[in-house]
Every structure is written in C-alpha cells, then in structure tokens.
Amino acid sequence: MDTPITHWRAPLLWRAAQLAARGLVGLLGRLKVSGDVPDDLRHGPLVLAVNHISPFDPVVLAAACQVRGIHPRIMATGGLFRAPVIGSLMRRAGHIRVDRGTRSVHHSLETAAGAVAGGSVVLVYPEGRIGLDPGMWPERGKTGAARLAFASGAPVVPVAQWGSHEVLPYRAPKGMLRGLARAVLRRPVIRVRFGAPVLLRDLHPGTPGAARRATGRIIDAITDELVPLRPDEPDRPRHVDPGRPIETTRVHRRRPAR
C-alpha cells in the first residue's frame, strides 16, 4: 500500500509576502511568466533550480511562483537571517539558512532534503552566488542542488529568469536608490520561465561523479530555458552594471544547441 504524499503548507505570512512581492515587481517592472510546473509537482516534493543574476532575484521568484500557485521555501544566505527584522520573517516563513563557506552548509543541505522529502518545494540557486559570467549566462554550478535531489528523491525543475539585474545593482544597497528610481521610470521587462523536469533517473547517487554530471545537466537545462528570454542579447547583456565584477574561472561549457 502506497504511503500518501504529504505537502508542506506555507504560513500565511509567506503567502502574504508573495502577494506583496508581486505588487513590488509590478511597480518596478513588467513581470512575464512562461512555462509551468505539472499539477502533481506544484505543491511538492520538488526542487526548483534557478539562475542567480541580481540581489532582486528572491523578490522576482517569490512573485513568479505566486503567479503559478507555488509557495517555495528558499535556501538563502545566512546574512539575511542575521538581519534584525528580515531574519525573523525568514525563519517564520520557513526558509532555509545557508552559511556558505562554513561546515554548517552540510547541515543546511540535510535540512533542505528533509523539507523536500516532507513535501516542500525548495528553491535553490545551483551557482551558489550571483553569477559573474561575462555574458551573464549560468556559471558552472555547485553540486548542492544535485545532492539535494539525490537525497530527497524529488524531481528538479529548471527555472530561468532575466531582467532583475536592471532593477537592483550587484553591490546593493550601494546604488540601490538610483537603481530603483531608474526601474520605476523605465519599467524593464522581467521574464521568468519554468522548464520541464531534468532527467536524472539514470544517475546513481553512489557512483563517482554522479553529482557533478547531474549538476551539469541542471545548469544546461536552466541555460536552455534562458535562451528564449534574451533572444536579442545572446552574447552580452544590453544593461551593463559597472559595479558587477567579471570572472571566467567558473564559465560553464554549454552543450552545442540542438
């Protein structure tokens, strides 16, 4: 007899915050959401793997997920949880703290795996940071998202986004007011696209290199979803943030287009 799947119920606080995020994104830009998540996955267990291009990303993703009726628990940097007011709200909303570069990262992964296995949708940035790729394409990822999928047994849905970098600069809060004012005036198009689940069933978690191969597939899938969101910007973004550094050590070698 199959055990029925339980689903995490998002706190009212987080549902209200998602509505507020949708309103804020609508004030600062024009949100366009494409693609979707299958009905049987919408409420979990599920891993959403998203490219990271701006400090404004969490707000954009909260809004886009609200449009699609999804209430994800976000794996977020420990800095947010240490903030006096925001930290308390993050904890009460059920989000998961990640202190990068510390031993507690493994504990965060275990917490996230338990959350997914318990019926949650968990949103993770496989790159592990705001990407510094010269063309703003997804970087070579960390293996956390793949290991989370292996540990929980949940499917991974790639999510691509484009446009949030035109709202908040890389070094926010430095330059934040200027960026927000520019966004209110220009109202850039902010696009989010949900893709089809990534095929990982043929990979065995115990096989050497499996997590790295799975990570490559996840990043490839995010890249595939990002391509149609920036058709006129295949090599370099039109909007260039002068405060955003460039780094080539983690450039992801994308597979040739089919």
Protein language model regions, located:
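Helix-to-loop junction immediately C-terminal to a conserved catalytic motif
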Residues: 14, 21-52
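Short gly/ser/thr-rich secondary-structure transition/capping motifs
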Residues: 27-34, 103-106, 174-177
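Catalytic core of membrane glycerolipid acyltransferases/transacylases, capturing the structured
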Residues: 40-102
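Hydrophobic/aromatic ligand-binding patch that stacks against planar heteroaromatic rings
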Residues: 64, 89, 114, 147-151
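Catalytic-site beta-strand/loop segments enriched in glycine and acidic/polar residues
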Residues: 115-146
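A cross-family acyltransferase "interaction/gating" segment
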Residues: 135-206, 239-242
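Short, highly charged C-terminal tails/helix-capping segments
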Residues: 230-255
